């Protein structure tokens, strides 16, 4: 069965695994999902991610994300929200890039220069599609 919105599926898997205090979560691989995982890692929301090749008899690579928790199992991801959806795309110019929780969170932007955070896109002076907010 095909997936209508793979990024929403990824964010939902992350949110659910985080709420259940799982150590890791696996999902089907795509370059876009790897880019989102890379941003989450560089911003400190996850520990790491790993791309595994399919075993014999399986189809497609798998992306495994290792979640990050504090000393007393405090969640590093308080919330995740999908902004631009297949039925309603949301774009922003570099002058109108959103601030998530006054700069405490991060907006993931798909630009002509690849996936960037709202801060990186603002520094480079590029706008794009606002994929998600993470805080």
UniProtKB/Swiss-Prot annotation:
One of its GO terms (cellular component) is ribonucleoprotein complex. It comes from the Bacteria. Part of the 30S ribosomal subunit. Contacts proteins S5 and S12. Belongs to the universal ribosomal protein uS8 family. One of the primary rRNA binding proteins, it binds directly to 16S rRNA central domain where it helps coordinate assembly of the platform of the 30S subunit. GO terms for biological process: translation. Keywords: Ribonucleoprotein, Ribosomal protein, RNA-binding, rRNA-binding. It comes from Nocardioides sp. (strain ATCC BAA-499 / JS614). Pfam families: Ribosomal_S8. InterPro entries: Ribosomal_uS8, Ribosomal_uS8_sf. SUPFAM superfamilies: Ribosomal protein S8 (SSF56047). GO terms for molecular function: rRNA binding; structural constituent of ribosome. This is Small ribosomal subunit protein uS8. HAMAP family: Ribosomal_uS8_B.
């Amino acid at each position: 069965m095909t997936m209508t919105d793979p990024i929403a599926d990824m964010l939902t898997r992350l949110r659910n695994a985080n709420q259940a205090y799982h150590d890791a979560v696996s999902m089907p691989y795509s370059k876009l999902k790897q880019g989102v995982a890379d941003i989450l890692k560089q911003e400190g929301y996850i520990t790491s991610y790993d791309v595994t090749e399919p075993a014999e008899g399986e189809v497609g690579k798998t992306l495994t994300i290792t979640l990050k928790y504090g000393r007393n199992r405090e969640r590093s991801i308080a919330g995740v929200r999908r902004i631009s959806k297949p039925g309603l795309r949301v774009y922003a110019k570099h002058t109108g890039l959103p601030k998530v929780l006054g700069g405490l969170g991060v907006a993931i932007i798909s630009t002509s220069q690849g996936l960037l955070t709202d801060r990186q896109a603002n520094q480079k002076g590029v706008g794009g599609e606002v994929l998600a907010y993470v805080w």
